[in-house]
Amino acid sequence: MDIDPYKEFGASVELLSFLPSDFFPSVRDLLDTASALYREALESPEHCSPHHTALRQATLCWGELMNLATWVGSNLADPASRDLVVNYVNVNMGLKFRQLLWFHISCLTFGRETVLEYLVSFGVWIRTPPAYRPPNAPILSTLPETTVVRRRGRSPRRRTPSPRRRRSQSPRRRRSKSRESQC
């Protein structure tokens, strides 16, 4: 069965795979962030959002995986085998959890649309040959300020004419008004 945990959120495993593995913070840091920002909502018996539910599930699954890792560490006598299991969990499963936690925390923090726009813009940036792309990758926290997305069906905003300067005002008065408008 091919299950994509991001499908219902408009994303995909492939879209997140454009971000390099070292982009994602550690699971511990992500869990601490989720707890610091959303503890009340995550511990609430109320349903808050699908992102909260996904974070709850990921947190519970990570806890169970750590219990299994502890059991393996205690019960697997061969150090080489133990290292292989620990390495597999950290590299493969750890990355999947880091991606999952990052995605849902980011959606709650910045909004799902912003995160999806970021993933698409990063994917375009990373696939563009270095000679033709800007030197710096897009940054999620600045995306809402710099991204212009035109939705279908919306007419462009009308431009309002600039205010006309009244000739009867003295230059001193005009300067003070321009200072006010800069603030």
Swiss-Prot record:
> Where in this protein does the record put region Disordered?
136-183
InterPro entries cross-referenced by the UniProt entry: Hepatitis_core, Viral_capsid_core_dom_sf_HBV
The UniProt regions of compositional bias labelled Basic residues, in chain numbering, are 149-177
Homology family: Belongs to the orthohepadnavirus core antigen family.
Q: What is its main location?
A: virion
Gene name in the database record: C
Give the domain of life.
Viruses
Name listed for the protein in its UniProt record: Capsid protein
State the organism of origin.
Answer: Hepatitis B virus genotype C subtype ar (isolate Japan/S-207/1988) (HBV-C)
Q: Which GO molecular function entries does the Swiss-Prot or TrEMBL record give? A: DNA binding; RNA binding; structural molecule activity
Q: How is it modified after translation?
A: Phosphorylated by host SRPK1, SRPK2, and maybe protein kinase C or GAPDH. Phosphorylation is critical for pregenomic RNA packaging. Protein kinase C phosphorylation is stimulated by HBx protein and may play a role in transport of the viral genome to the nucleus at the late step during the viral replication cycle.
Please tell me which stretches of this chain the record labels as motif Bipartite nuclear localization signal. 158-175
- Could you tell me which residues carry Phosphoserine? 155, 162, 170
Q: Which UniProt keywords apply?
A: Capsid protein, Cytoplasmic inwards viral transport, DNA-binding, Host cytoplasm, Host-virus interaction, Microtubular inwards viral transport, Phosphoprotein, Repeat, RNA-binding, T=4 icosahedral capsid protein, Viral penetration into host nucleus, Virion, Virus entry into host cell
Pfam families reported in the protein's UniProt record: Hepatitis_core
Q: How does it assemble?
A: Homodimerizes, then multimerizes. Interacts with cytosol exposed regions of viral L glycoprotein present in the reticulum-to-Golgi compartment. Interacts with human FLNB. Phosphorylated form interacts with host importin alpha; this interaction depends on the exposure of the NLS, which itself depends upon genome maturation and/or phosphorylation of the capsid protein. Interacts with host NUP153.
Q: Where is this region: 3 X 7 AA repeats of S-P-R-R-R-[PR]-S?
A: 155-176
Q: Which GO terms describe its cellular component?
A: host cell; host cell cytoplasm; T=4 icosahedral viral capsid
